Amino acid sequence: GTTPSRELYKFFDREGNTLVLRPDFTPSMARCAAKYFMDETLPIRFSYLGNTFTNTSNLQGKLKEVTQLGAELIQEPSVEADGEMIALMVEALKSSGLEDFQVSIGQVEYFKGICSQAGLDEETEDELRDYISSKNFFGVQELLERKAIRRDYCEILLKVNDLFGSAEALQRAKELVSNERSLQAVERLEELYRVLCEYGVERYVSFDLGLLSKYHYYTGVIFKAYTYGVGDAVAKGGRYDNLLKYFGKEAPAIGFVIVVDDLLEALARQKKVPRLRADGVLIIYEEGRFRDALKKAKELRVQQIPAELIPAISGADSSDTGSFDKNVKIYREKSKNHMQKAFYYMPAEGGCMEELLDRN
C-alpha cells in the first residue's frame, strides 16, 4: 500500500472483505489509466476532483476528509512534461487568486543515490527519509551513529537538508556527491529549471534536495507549494514512473493535487477573493417572461457561456430602464460574481434590453 495501515479507514462487507475509503488519488488514477487506456501509446492527460480520507488523529487540527483537485500526465517521461505539470500547478494557484506562494522542488533519486552508495538497507533508508523530510537534524545524526554508517556518508546525509534555495543550490548539491545516480538527478533538475524559465514561472520556484515524501512510489522530481496562512502545502505532486506496472501497464507518469480545503483557508486568511470567470451573462426577467429568459439562457449555455437567471426585484422604478438599472445595482451589491453582459426581459410582451456591464 501507499498509505500506512494505521491511517486508513477500514470497513468490512458481508463477505468479510476489507473495504477502505480512498486515502490517496494517485493509485486510483494509475489504475484508471491502466484499465481504460491499456493500448494507448500517446500521452494521456487527466483531471479530477474528489475527496480523500486519512485517519490523522495524531495531528490536531488537520482535516480527516479533504477535497483534492488534481491533474495527471501519463506516458510522457520527458523533463518538458515535468515542467508542464509544475507550470500548470503554478497557473492554477494564480488563477485562484493566490499571489504569494513558493514551489519547492526536489528529486527523490538524489537521496536514493546517496543511500545506495552508502549501502543502507530499506528499513534504515525509510527511517532516514522520515527524519530528513521532517527536517529533524538530530534524528538523522542519532540514526547514522546508531547504524555505524561511514563518516564520509554521514557528512553527506547530514548536509542534505542544507541543499535548498535558488538554482545555485543545485551546484552545491553536485559538488557534495560522486555517485552517478545522484548526479543525474541534479542534472535533471537543472534541465527542469531551464524549462520552467521558458514557461516564465521561475520566480515561483526554489529547490530543496531534502524534500521527500512518505509515498514510496515517487521516482523522480517531487514538488510542494507553500503559502502563508496554513501550516501545510496547498499543492503537491511528483513523478511516479513505476506505479502503473502494478496495474498491468508499463508507463511513466507525473501529476499533482491542489488541497482545496487548505487553499481556501489560505485565501480567506490572506483576504483574497477567488477569481471567477468574467465572461458570463446575467439574465433578469419580469413576471411572465421566464420562458423567454430560459430560452436565452439555454442558447448561451450551449455555447459554453455561463448564464445566470434571476427574477426582477419587485418595487423597482416603473420605467423599463429604471427597473433594469436597479436590478443590476442590487445584483452587484449582493453577489461577488462578475458578469460581462446583462439581458433584461421587460414585463408582458415587452422587448429585451441588452447592456455590457462595467466590471470595475
Where are these regions (language model features)?
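Glycine-centered secondary-structure boundary/capping sites
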Residues: 1, 97-100, 113, 119, ...
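Glycine-rich loop at the start of a catalytic domain that most often binds anionic cofactors/ligands
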Residues: 1-6, 10
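Positively charged, Gly/Ser-enriched RNA/tRNA-binding surfaces
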Residues: 6, 15-16, 26-39, 46-98, ...
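Short, glycine/charge-rich beta-strand/loop segments that flank catalytic centers
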Residues: 44-55, 102-113
